UniProtKB/Swiss-Prot annotation:
Low complexity: bias regions: 218-229, 383-398
Feature: compositional bias, Acidic residues: 72-85
Biased composition (Polar residues): 340-354, 410-438
Cross-referenced InterPro entries: JHY (IPR027968)
Organism phylogeny: Eukaryota, Metazoa, Chordata, Craniata, Vertebrata
Disordered as annotated region, ranges: 1-249, 295-438, 493-527, 595-647, 708-740
UniProt tissue specificity: Expressed in the brain, specifically in hypothalamus, pineal gland, and ependymal cells of the aqueduct of Sylvius, as well as in the choroid plexus of the third ventricle. Expressed in the ependymal cells lining the lateral ventricles (at protein level).
Organism the protein comes from: Mus musculus (Mouse)
Name the UniProt record assigns to this protein: Jhy protein
Function as written in the Swiss-Prot or TrEMBL entry: Required for the normal development of cilia in brain ependymal cells lining the ventricular surfaces.
Recorded name of the encoding gene: Jhy
GO CC, alphabetical: extracellular region
Basic and acidic residues bias spans: 57-71, 112-134, 295-314, 493-509
Amino acid sequence: MNKYKPVPKLSSQSPVHHTNLRIPPSGRPFKKEDFLNLISKDSLESDSESLPQEAKSWSDIKDQIQDKDMEPDSLEEDSPSETEEAVNRKAAHNTNREDLSAHDAGVNHSQHQVEDKYSDLRYDPNWKNKREEGQPLAGEALPGSADSSSENLPLAPLYPSREPSMGLSAGKGKEKKSPQSEASLLGSEFLSPKYERSTRQNGFFSELSDSDQEEKSSGLSQYLKSSSSHNDVFLPGSRGPRRRKSKQYFVEKNKLTLGLPMPKTDSYLQLHNKKRGETRLEQISYPVRDTDKMTVQNDKEVENTFMDPEDKWHQRAKQLKNYQEHLSQYEDTKSGNVPRGQSSDAANGQQPSRRTAKARVRKQRKHQKGLKSLGTKELVVSQNNQNNPFQQPQNQRQTADASAKHELAAQTNASNPNLQDARTLTHNPKVTSDSFVSPKQALDRALYKNSISGLNANKRRGHRREEERILYQPQPIYVFSDTHLQDFNELPHRHESPSQRAPQSDHHMNTHRSTKTKKPAKQPQAETKYKNIEMLWKFHSSSDMEPASASPDSRLAQIMEQHQQALMQLAEVQPSEGSLASIILPPILSRVESESQLNSERSHRHQVKMARSNSEGYLLQLERGKRHRKRSSTKSSKLKGYQKRDVKLGGLGPDFASVRDKMQMLMQQKEYAQQVKDYNMKALSILSKPQTSKTESKSAISRKKALDYAKTIPKPKPPNLPDQTAKKTKNSRHSEKEGGLPEISLLEILQSRHEREKQAVAAFKVLHIV
């Protein structure tokens, strides 16, 4: 099993594509000095292959380096800013291929070797033993690299500026490079204890011409700019000897890889991302004009590398706090230049502070919220204002003009970010008057512009909000006059310096026109505010009949005067009855007359708006008339009476009071129904009795008459029969009567039996049997 030494991990997307790196065979270990020789040799050669071949070979080399790397925490994602820098540097590096294409063709053929692309994807059963044996090797190799890097760190700053690269390219053209100069170019991340021996073996630096050295030194400086931001993470010596991690760390790391939820908040990846963001922010915000300041800041950064992470974090927090204070002071001075009825000495730069402490605290909180979205331009302005207090008013005027230009550029070209960046670079005096701009650094300027394009967009958005807040603040209605409007329109020309008037006259005309178009935008709101008022409609109709050639300032002044007159007349016409004090409406008849007049004058669009508002007013008038009628009829129909009605609201649960009231109402209804039923029954009985008496009287009268009539009728006489027949009938009747009676003997038998049974029953009763 092979034992490898730890190799410093490079950024995954480097600006220089190493297509000619020789990959060592798997038989011998992968040493750091071989890798340095390959890097130095390849960085001074140009690419002769096409871009797809470069990308393929670089991906193979990156896979091989990741396979040899022994650091466990190499799972990181590349930021989109690194990919943009890689693309830009690739385009810059392609310009140097034409000079060295012939030399590179011969070397390429001999350096390509067949390798296994998928070696890192195959399963290795001895992965645990490899890791355990690789960790002591990493611990042994740390002290030497830390010492060498600490010795050579003061020679190469962490953030190399453009001036040292220019000086190296111009001054050391014909001389052989010393190890110190090479260390300053390569940076502290490529230093090792055997670096001098590798530089002696590599004699390719001395064979190059002056132009080749010039171009390659600038290319190396560009490369080191991107890689220097990762020094704190990838350098073992920058943070002292690395501690040996326990097995529990790797268990948690594997859990994180498998996607299990981890409660750990301060993981290595999060800390590294925070540190990388801080170094990226510092790298963007560090270009200052004076070279002395640059060297001092670089020395401070070198000192910061030996500090503890906590002390470093506290120092960064202090710097951020100072930056917030400078930014708040700069915003206060910038907002003081805005014309709000101020005097002439305030317009000339002497700004009396009339704000209260509460307003200042509110503004500071607002700036602290939007602090991360601001770019480096405001930082440079605030630093210059602090260092040069005599030039502060002029800088404030320049930043005010620049904010207006940023707003105009963002409104006209929101779909083209490259054009926006070009306009900000051409219009902004801070960028165009840079002291260290040179033709050699045009590509660096483009890269710097791309890196802060997002910040510039956020800053333009902040400037636009500031301008809108200033322009759309509620103006005092009765104090606004024509002179103030004229001063407000002429103030950008007043703040403009004489050196800037000539190239920026066209731009100020555009901003002046945009502010003019923004001012009448308050008119529709004023119209909707007084829609239901008759007098104001008359004034608006007269203002609409004005010719279109009138300027917006005069129209605004006339509208203000008309509003004042309308309010004066409304104070006289306001009704005194006033059931509701907030409703101010004229009589309905005059409203209809004004509607008929306005229909003949206004356009169809205004007719629709007016009809809608008139319908709303008509409904209000109907309600008002109903209330007046109620007031005339009853005393209780007042506003207080209406407010006191139906005030009680039901709760969420059952309302026992309402249930009890309903039950009482039902009982009362039943009682009333029963009373009604009884009353109806009584009424029916009383009415039926006279009817029966009448019928009985009628029947009795008829019966009486019939009986009286029957008494008067004589009885018929029986016929005279012979005597024999009469005797026969008498004898037959007597015989029938005698045959029907029972015999006497039978009757006696039954009677005696009855007596015996009576005695037996009496005996049973005596014996208590029955």
